[in-house]
């Protein structure tokens, strides 16, 4: 391999032997003064340096990166395991006997309030952990931060598994384990996005969601395997396996390279160079490593010159920080408002209502569909782009909810709810619930994490991802807590509520979510600095790759009515 790539000739600066970088990056990025100079005004032809080609080392590079990112993404498995197991716990006899209340006939049950609290309080812990504990990633590094939050998660599991008959002890354990998972949901996608190459970033961040679905599926299977026991094996064995997952996660962190962006920010340049070299499987002195390192250094220096980011700058900073922060909050909120947890948290109970003799088996079917559908997203997210997947995923879920809710309302109980349900209607609802899961798992499930991991500059990234994730968890709490009450009052009309949310989601994505497929994290920031319209963002080209006929101004204005491009593929 030649030491200098064919694509460029390195230009020396007057002060050092470094490569000339794209010095026209937004000078106003997150500046406290709020000055947002035109991106084009800061560029001259001599300042634009073509991007250096990555080392041509074959598929081995992708294997190395993929293994590292899968280890980090295993944090999603921990989250998914909780989702898959708690849905079965609330229907298991020993769990009901220990933590529930007694009917007059001697049978045990969980009240709607207690069920909602036990299931949903986990989300409140996650919201707090995402905001408070994610800061560990900035203080000590993403890897160390992940190890610490996994330890906190384990403490919560110990409290839960030690519970004998006090539901509030189990409740407290759920809060503490939620703190750990909240930190994981911020730090895992963050580390993956900062390690992965731009051309594979969407796919590799989506591995986090694949791990969530694998955890949900195996959690369902474990519940199915323990449900016939009559003692605490029903729920303590699934909880006990959490220790194995925590140890695997901690062990994996020993082999994962630290985020080069964090290392540069911490002044550990040699370690950052080694991290980039390990991920790209090439020598530390390779020109591509030098180019990537100096690009990151330039970005970090601009952020450092602007000073420490305050929480207020998430909404007042430049470029377009208010728009970006609100987009992160909305995307994460809308991911919950798809209604996925309606099925995953309460799937066992919901399908008891449609007359199934073994609703645990139905949950396993859901888990299989969810897992393999999410695997499909590894192809779709970087093939079709973020915007297309989000919009057409919303359309697919709307169609599924129309059928699911309509059949549930009009055909499930033809002779009244006090009479046997229609088996045909119940089967139809299960089929369209599976179609819904396919639409969700291939689009909104992974891409919500991809979007928030890509769209924030490093200086405020942990804060932005924390507040966006907190919005997700808060909505998760509200949906999880109130679902038993809402379904008790309106039953399957609930599906129409989620359908309306997905109609709104389609239009929100069209107007406010830009396309970031194939862009580096620094290039995403440049795109925001230029003020590109989201529905034209798929045509945006980074400065270093533009031809002479490229018209950047055309992407900032739209002279035709928006409805003409509303259903376009861009």
UniProtKB/Swiss-Prot annotation:
GO terms for molecular function: carbohydrate:proton symporter activity; D-glucose transmembrane transporter activity; fructose transmembrane transporter activity; galactose transmembrane transporter activity; mannose transmembrane transporter activity; pentose transmembrane transporter activity. Induction: Repressed at high glucose concentrations. Residues 82-116, 165-174, 223-236, 358-363, 410-431, 491 are extracellular. Residues 1-51 are annotated as: Disordered. Residues 1-20 have a biased composition (Polar residues). SUPFAM superfamilies: MFS general substrate transporter. The chain crosses the membrane at residues 61-81, 117-137, 144-164, 175-195, 202-222, 237-257, 341-357, 364-381, 389-409, 432-452, 470-490, 492-512. Residues 1-60, 138-143, 196-201, 258-340, 382-388, 453-469, 513-570 are cytoplasmic. Keywords: Glycoprotein, Membrane, Phosphoprotein, Repeat, Sugar transport, Transmembrane, Transmembrane helix, Transport. Residues 34-43 have a biased composition (Basic and acidic residues). One of its GO terms (biological process) is D-glucose transmembrane transport. The keyword Cell division does not apply. It is a multi-pass membrane protein. It comes from the Eukaryota. One of its GO terms (cellular component) is plasma membrane. The modification Phosphoserine is found at residues 23, 38, 44. Glycans are attached at residue 228. Low-affinity glucose transporter. HXT1 is as well involved in the transport of mannose. Belongs to the major facilitator superfamily. Sugar transporter (TC 2.A.1.1) family. PANTHER family: GALACTOSE TRANSPORTER-RELATED (PTHR48022:SF75), PLASTIDIC GLUCOSE TRANSPORTER 4 (PTHR48022). Glucose transport is thought to be mediated by two kinetically distinct systems, a glucose-repressible high-affinity system and a constitutive low-affinity system. This is Low-affinity glucose transporter HXT1. It comes from Saccharomyces cerevisiae (strain ATCC 204508 / S288c). The lineage of its organism: Eukaryota, Fungi, Dikarya, Ascomycota, Saccharomycotina. The gene is HXT1.
